[in-house]
Amino acid sequence: MEVIMNSSIVKLPNKYELVKDTLVLILAGGRGSRLYELTDKRAKPALYFGGNRRIIDFALSNCLNSGLNRIGVVTQYAAHSLLRHLQNGWSFLPAERGEFIDMLPARQQIDDSTWYRGTADAVYQNMAIIRDHYCPKYILILAGDHIYKQDYSQMLLDHIHSGAKCTVGCIEVEREKATEFGVMAVNENLKVKSFVEKPKDPPAMVGKPNTSLASMGIYVFDADYLYDVLEREVSSPYTSHDFGKDILPKALEEGVLYAHPFSRSCMGRNTEGEIYWRDVGTLDSFWQSNIDLVCENPQLDIYDQSWPIRGNPVQTYPSKFFYKKENARPVDNSLISGGCVITDASISYSVLFDRIKINEGSQIDHCVVLPQVTIGKNCKLKRCIIDRHSVIPDGMEIGVDLELDRQRFRVSSGGVVLVTPSMLKKLNGEEVASEAHLD
């Protein structure tokens, strides 16, 4: 395809050439501090989601579905479970065809620093490998901790057609929630006119006083431009080594920053045509995003085979339900993964991961239960997140009396109760030793 740019005819690559010349970098080193104990021993991208997936599976699946198969995963905090997941579930790309998912852990490279100092520094510290070994023309940078379906090839096409050197993915959000994002304004050609990172008073969109245009943390760069701007930025005494705070403002200042609306490349909309993108960075948002999946027509369709979300499901026996009571309605509007054993218990509006045992008389209502949990007899759990390997003793009630729960567990601002094995051990007076979290 040929277009006119700056009074010259330029031949643009087609989609196949474009994805072949693109390296994807997934930033997966975040701790997720607002998830508290849920990410104490695992990186946020390694957190379970949707019954038998992990959060990073969405970014990785989007890449493969978009035709992108040259991928680097940049890791840092508590990376062991993430690395095991990638090795066990994502090692199938054929290296002989130039396809790969490589791990890029934080390590001593440029100077004596061993930790990445920010999102931009995570790329800068690996720049020699990227430039000299992978040799891309374009670099797609993704966050590894968001839930969504997107065709990145469309964003890449928009990037080259606009003549941008940097393109940022954007989505409309409620203005009152935009304080957690970078917020921008664009002209009719989607060239970014202003950008501010996490403003206290987010600017509204023209004609939409209650809506702001927010960054999704997804960026496409011309590789040569990214190398240049990172080299210049690292020498600045005022840099915070962050894409939103430093790199995007620099691209804006130089007039090469464009926006890509998520609506142009969103995949898997529901029957109402709604787009879906979630940052599950809090206990409430993590719980709600999982519970949303149990409704009849969820915004996120995890059963859509036209845009599949791959993962590393555990090999288990089928789940078993055993009920002695007649006319019982044991399971209602719930997701139940493999290897679960449910005996005379009621489950409603809940997501159960693999290998969970629930004993007779227990009631599970609006709960997200992570793998290998045992729930005793006659328990009552409501609006809970139960972390992996937890053992709930007979007769325990959680989510019924939030004041009592605040003394025993962690209660979110939205009234969701987080329960972990360590909390239960402390409650029983057991000593809690520091232990590796192999999940």
UniProtKB/Swiss-Prot annotation:
Coiled coil: none annotated. GO terms for molecular function: ATP binding; glucose-1-phosphate adenylyltransferase activity. PROSITE patterns: ADP_GLC_PYROPHOSPH_1, ADP_GLC_PYROPHOSPH_2, ADP_GLC_PYROPHOSPH_3. Pfam families: Hexapep_GlmU, NTP_transferase. Alpha-D-glucose 1-phosphate binds at residues 116, 182, 197-198, 215. Keywords: ATP-binding, Carbohydrate metabolism, Glycogen biosynthesis, Glycogen metabolism, Nucleotide-binding, Nucleotidyltransferase, Transferase. InterPro entries: ADP-Glc_PPase, ADP_Glu_pyroP_CS, GlgC_bac, GlmU/GlgC-like_hexapep, NTP_transferase_dom, Nucleotide-diphossugar_trans, Trimer_LpxA-like_sf. One of its GO terms (biological process) is glycogen biosynthetic process. It catalyses: alpha-D-glucose 1-phosphate + ATP + H(+) = ADP-alpha-D-glucose + diphosphate. It is an enzyme of class 2 (transferase). Pathway: Glycan biosynthesis; glycogen biosynthesis. It comes from the Bacteria. Its EC number is 2.7.7.27. Belongs to the bacterial/plant glucose-1-phosphate adenylyltransferase family. Homotetramer. Involved in the biosynthesis of ADP-glucose, a building block required for the elongation reactions to produce glycogen. Catalyzes the reaction between ATP and alpha-D-glucose 1-phosphate (G1P) to produce pyrophosphate and ADP-Glc. This is Glucose-1-phosphate adenylyltransferase. It comes from Pasteurella multocida (strain Pm70). The gene is glgC.
